[in-house]
Amino acid sequence: MVALDPRINPFRPEIAANHLRGHVEAKRFVEGSRHQIIDPVTAVRRTPSHDARLDTEALLGERMTIYETTDEGWAWGQLETDGYVGWLSSNALGAVGATPTHKVTVPRAFAFAGPDIKLPPAVALPMGARVAVTRQDERFAVTALGWHIPEVYLAPVKMRQSDFVAVAERFVGTPYLWGGKTSLGLDCS
């Protein structure tokens, strides 16, 4: 058998994704179930412990296939966006909802309960968080969750930034964080 990288292939000695049958050894193989990240950002760890190494972070709206859950509130699976495999709090997972249509394009964006920036923010979203926009309300995009986000902070999910240097410059001064994917801490990869 070819050695596969367990950071991007969902297998451990006790469990593996069904599509890896014949490629890895495991006590059992499972199909997995799709879920969606419902927290703005959540840690994806090497082992099911809050003290475990951070391998990456999952952002709001990302989809993840879950292969195992524990009674202690952990879930083990693989992110669809970058393929990373790891453990995260099962509280950060929800049912697959509306397909994200837009992503946050600034380092941080507030979402509000209504179309007014004077309202208390409902949540702060990191760059790359994905939301399903259902309509416009003045200068705000309204999401399937009922949040109002200033539309200037969003772009269609498939849109790519043409000037990656300008995007990187927005993060000058951001501290290094192994596995980090937000303006609170970034990994070099």
PLM feature spans:
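Second-shell loop/turn segments in exported
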Residues: 175-182
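Boundary regions of SH3-family modules and the immediately adjacent low-complexity/disordered segments
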Residues: 1-33, 49, 62-65, 72, ...
